Structures are given as C-alpha cells and as structure tokens.
C-alpha cells in the first residue's frame, strides 16, 4: 500500500475558493458557445502541494466515483461513453451519440495520437518510459489538442495539455519528486474545475507509484476561467462555507502498469465535505 504523508493536523486550503471569489468579483461578462453567458477572467494559476493532502474540494461534496472512473476511461483510450454508462457514470451523456460515440476525445488522443504514416503514438506509455529513463527531460508532455481531429470530437478538449517535472526527492529511497502542470483552455470553475484538479492529482499519484517517485505539486493553469450565469446562486452558497482540511489518498496495490488500475484500488481517507450543490451543465 502507498499512502500520502501529510502533516497533522492537515491545514485547510482555500486556493480554489479564493479563485472562485476572484472571478465572481473581478470577472467580465462575456457571451459563450453555449448561449448561457459567463463571468470570466483570462489566465489564472493554482498550486497544490500533494504532500499536504489530496486536493478534493471540501466546500461541496464532489462525486469521486465519477472522477476515478473517468480517468480510468481516459487511460483505456476509449472514445465511447458506454463503458462509463455501464458503471453508472453519466457525465458524458450530454455529448454522446445514441450509441455512446464521442469521436476521438481525450483518451483516444492520449493513447492513439495518429501519425502521418498511419501509425499511432501512445503518449501515456511514452510518459512512463521517459519518467523511468530520462526524468530530467523537458519534453514529458501529453496533448489532447489534435487540431486535425477537433472537428470529429463531440466536445473539444477543455483540459488540453499537461507536462511532468521530476525534482530531487525528499526520501533516499525515492528516485525523485513528481509534479504535473495542466493547461486548461476553458474552465467551468463551479462544475468542472474541482473534477479536473482531483483527476490530474490522481494521475500524478498513479504515475509516481509506477515510476518509484514521490509526489510533488499539481499546478493548475487556466485560460478562459468562467462562472456560468446559471451557477451564480450555487457559487454564493459555496462561498458562504468554510473550507475544511483535504483528505488523503491511499492506493491499495501497485498494479503491473499505469493501465491496470481498478476503481477499488483507491481509497480517500478523511474526506469531510459540506453537502453537494447541484447545478446545470452548459452544453
């Protein structure tokens, strides 16, 4: 088993809530593709030290099952929502065709980026290879933004590009400390961003385990960061609540590869969120 070390008591962190408040107070009113309307700022960054806890938002309950299964679905290289639907996850249903097809979305690009000669690049396998053999590389990058495939996608990638970085580790037994930075070109702060933070933090933990690394930071960088107009009441409710300490993540086993994890391999310990807050998805 591998457990995330954390100080006791764990501190309550408010980067996400501070970000939400900043956009509410300083954003500009903008139109958007969905016709819903937003309050938006351009450019924001948050840094989460994964040694201090697992960054799962506490000012509302976040549906962890959907986060974990969606990440495993991405790692399968899947472009059809059926696998998720069979496991009770409906977060992609609004964009899926009747047969579940979504086109060459995230997982397809991660695992099967097409090359001009008719081949494919498995970007995730390449990340694992580089982390194990060349951890100082500045090219440990995954992109979901395949310009040629964008018209075929049911939804163009919002979280589009991420990079890994290995620093010296704190423990003599570790090969280094793994950090990840995500660039998210479009960020639905109330509904989407809590999922995205947790998803990439989880991926960082998984890769660290597979590559004998400690976890470092997860850095979230956003482009168009927005609150939808029909989320304003929900945002006010969330911002009226005090953040609580982050939980910790325990990975119960080390599977043979990054592609062999199961939902049951993960346990979140000490998650004590405020109640969930429902809001409509802008399609």
From Swiss-Prot:
Its main location: cytoplasm. HAMAP family: Thymidy_synth_bact. NCBIfam families: PRK01827.1-3, PRK01827.1-5, thym_sym. (6R)-5,10-methylene-5,6,7,8-tetrahydrofolate binds at residues 63, 188, 282. It is an enzyme of class 2 (transferase). One of its GO terms (biological process) is methylation. Keywords: Cytoplasm, Methyltransferase, Nucleotide biosynthesis, Transferase. InterPro entries: Thymidate_synth/dCMP_Mease, Thymidate_synth/dCMP_Mease_dom, Thymidate_synth/dCMP_Mease_sf, Thymidylate_synthase, Thymidylate_synthase_AS. Pathway: Pyrimidine metabolism; dTTP biosynthesis. DUMP binds at residues 33, 138-139, 185-188, 196, 226-228. Homodimer. It holds the Pfam family Thymidylat_synt. Coiled coil: none annotated. SUPFAM superfamilies: Thymidylate synthase/dCMP hydroxymethylase. It comes from Methylibium petroleiphilum (strain ATCC BAA-1232 / LMG 22953 / PM1). This is Thymidylate synthase. GO terms for cellular component: cytosol. Belongs to the thymidylate synthase family. Bacterial-type ThyA subfamily. It is found in: Cytoplasm. It catalyses: dUMP + (6R)-5,10-methylene-5,6,7,8-tetrahydrofolate = 7,8-dihydrofolate + dTMP. The active site is at 158 (nucleophile). GO terms for molecular function: thymidylate synthase activity. Its EC number is 2.1.1.45. Catalyzes the reductive methylation of 2'-deoxyuridine-5'-monophosphate (dUMP) to 2'-deoxythymidine-5'-monophosphate (dTMP) while utilizing 5,10-methylenetetrahydrofolate (mTHF) as the methyl donor and reductant in the reaction, yielding dihydrofolate (DHF) as a by-product. This enzymatic reaction provides an intracellular de novo source of dTMP, an essential precursor for DNA biosynthesis.
